[in-house]
Amino acid sequence: MRSKKIEGLIIRSKAQWISHGEKATRYFCNLEKRNFLNKTVGFLDRGNGHIISEQGNILKEVQHFYENLYSHNPAQDLDLEYLKNEAVLLDQGNTADLEGEITIDEVKQALVNMKNDKSPGPDGFTAEFYKAFFPDIGIFLVRSFNEAFSKGELSVTQYQGVITCIPKDGKPKQFIKNWRPISLLNVSYKLLSSCLAGRIKTVLPVIIHNSQKGFMKGRYIGENIRLLYDTILLTEKENIPGLLLMVDFEKAFDSVSWFFIEKALKFFNFPNNIISWFKILYKKANSCVSFNGQYSNWFKLHRGCRQGDPVSPYLYLICAEILSLMIRQNKKIKGITLRDKDVLLSLFADDTTLYLDGSEESFTEAIKMLEIFSKISGLKINNDKTQIAWIGSSRNSNVKYMRDKNFIWDPGTFKVLGIHFSVHTNEISHINFDGKLDEVKREISRWNKRNMTPLGKITIIKTLIVSKLTHLLINLPDPPLRFLKELDTVIYRFLWGGNTHKVKKSIMCKSYEDGGYKMLDIYNFITTLKIGWLRRLNEIEGTLSTWANLYPNLTKLSIFGQGYVQPCLKNIENPFWADVLKHYRKLCKVKRNSALKLTDVYEEPIHFNMNIKRSRKVIHDKEWESRGILQVKHVLNENGRPLTYNDFKLKYANTNTTARLYAGIINAIGKFLDNVKNGNCNVKNVLTSEVWACIGSGNKFVKELLLKDNEIPTALHKWNSEFNNLNWKSIFIHSMKISPDPQLKWFQARIIHRILPTKKYLHLCKLTHSPLCVFCDSHVETLNHLFWDCNFVQSFWKDLIKTLKEKCTHCVRLNLSKELILFGKIENVYTDKAIDSILLYAKYFVYKCKLQERIPLIDQCISELKHRITIEKVLASRTGKVNTFKDKWKLYAGMFDAGII
């Protein structure tokens, strides 16, 4: 009995690893975490030298801290009517969809959006539970929500939440203020809150100023980082005075007044329905604290937006917009003027940065507005964490306003939205990237001890290693080339367990269907990230108008040809945008892998097009540019031929273009069209229109364009000399679908790429004395010989087929071939999916026998197959695919234990 339990435990453990061990799942990402140890503390320091070490007293202290944090703190009332001239308010057209009863479709969508594998609330019911039983309980859930609205309150359990404390990175854990409270709320409550959040967020872009970048679709944290970096740079380059005021609100989400939230909702004309729902959600909210594995007593909440509540971020944004309005309407607060563009304020939720002209009046008025907002909202300005830095021509100033406030003046370096800044922009990249390689190496060393395939290591590289750098790579100038080279070396050394690349780097980065494994190319990765800024620059009208004003030439990249990049680079001093241009130029130099068609070039730009030259120079006519004559199609008739000069004058009246100038331009265009039509075009790179089609479609398409070439894996040249007409695309895809087990996937991949070590290879490397087969000891051991040509292996395959025929009378009659054994099902030769698995398991069994230097025997193979099928069954039961498993193996009950299948 005990041995059976142990065997079952081993099987379930293997199934867990196969299912999640090399994928970006919660199980995988938690393998190297020490969450419990990280979330425990042996003592607390009250800050006055008083240490608390007894666990019961620690829990009481934590409860007291949060009970006090969420206690009622009367906020002052203030008439906000004076702000309405600056504000955009909701009207009936905006609010129609905010009212009405909660619908089942809203709840269903909220449930779909909920992630699995998340900690439940106090009642213990998970999102998976609700998803499984929603067809049965959904209608009752919706009724309960609408009944709660009628009664004006929720049930007792729906109000409950457990506050779990997460320590802030890099801050001493013995101080309770350095822990972040996250509320674990019941899923039923979160579904209701999500429905209301879904309604509210649809109107936020209407009322929330573009200076706020938090929690709204189409707004991006990087825009605030970009604004800060470019402001520091331009004030420095153009000798403009400026002052940065970086405000820190203490526990902002947790201390905002409920009275103020209601007042803000009314100010923006939210309907009574939404205001009533807000009151219902917060009316009897109560929590306990989970700390050091213990739970405190329950206590009521009287203020704050609970972190973990789906509606909280949106309620906070509405409150923060009041502050934004107060600052923008105060004309005594003057921002920094950069190239006729005024920069004053940027926010990301509670992260607030003011860009001031440096005058005392602007500073004191800004502080005045902040203090008034603090009094009416319940938020407290954390003076000893609020940082102020002189920038531009004032960066060496010693002036300090309001010294009694104890603000941090001239902090040297300061952190905003995850990026470390300095008033000297040439230091910013070094500050952020120094030490990152050591951090990457430490992460790799933690994973190096695990026996993982390169497929699993690719997952680690993408999710846990490069992710440490992504935020920096998107928002800062590129790190030095030596940094990237060392990073690339470290990553690939980890991937292959040494310096030898067993498969070419360029092949590893390709898609599965092209013989690759979606490995990350760090250089292409950075290009893809940086190119995203060009998409943002062109697709969101108004959002990035700051950069359209600061760097107007950048907005013309999409309408001009590739010859425009070099003039732009000469005129731009910003290292970040210069890097963006260089990556764009790299994208434009991608080689074509298909012939040009005439229709391809109609969308091509006329100006700065390297393929359309007049007197060996690219064309740029300012009148044509101003009149929107930008693309080849703009000077073609309906038959695709160039317009005559008279037709051109009719289409573009009052033109200043002379007949001679027009003839010169049109001859250049006509020559390009004729060359394309006749197949004489020597265009080697992708077209500008193709590049922008990819940029507009998203990062995935940019990445695909960068990988666009006709290179094939080296091993295919050898295989193609041995086999005719193999469908490699089918073979590649099949190898990744043949098994959920990453070990078996990689085993098959090593065969395809001819990197599975045979004795012939080991002998060449002087790692073995003989190249002869471990089974027959008479022929050189190659892949062909090991899996097919060897007499012992041939005998093994015959025994397997014989066993199949004898014990599985209804299974497919299979004619084995060398291609089938080596590569699996190449075409739709048979529909029996179990055969694929049997052949793969058997082939892997042969390989294990080779390593153990024993002859492959059918009885041992059948035992191995039973074990693997049992693991498959466990996997099927965990993923809800038991019926699929049974359909796959039903014909083989005679060969294996019927109980297994």
Language-model regions: role of each:
Residues 172, 266, 402-405, 411, ...:
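Family-specific functional microsites
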Residues 32, 70, 94-322, 326, ...:
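Conserved pre-catalytic core of RNA-dependent polymerases
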Residues 86, 293, 381-412:
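Short, conserved micro-motifs composed of acidic
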Residues 1-65, 100-157, 163, 233-241, ...:
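Short, charged alpha-helical motifs in flexible N/C-terminal segments and linkers
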Residues 405-478, 531-543:
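Basic, alpha-helical interaction scaffolds
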Residues 121, 160-163, 180, 212-214, ...:
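Catalytic palm active-site di-aspartate
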Residues 487, 500-757, 854, 864-901:
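Extended C-terminal regions of large enzymes
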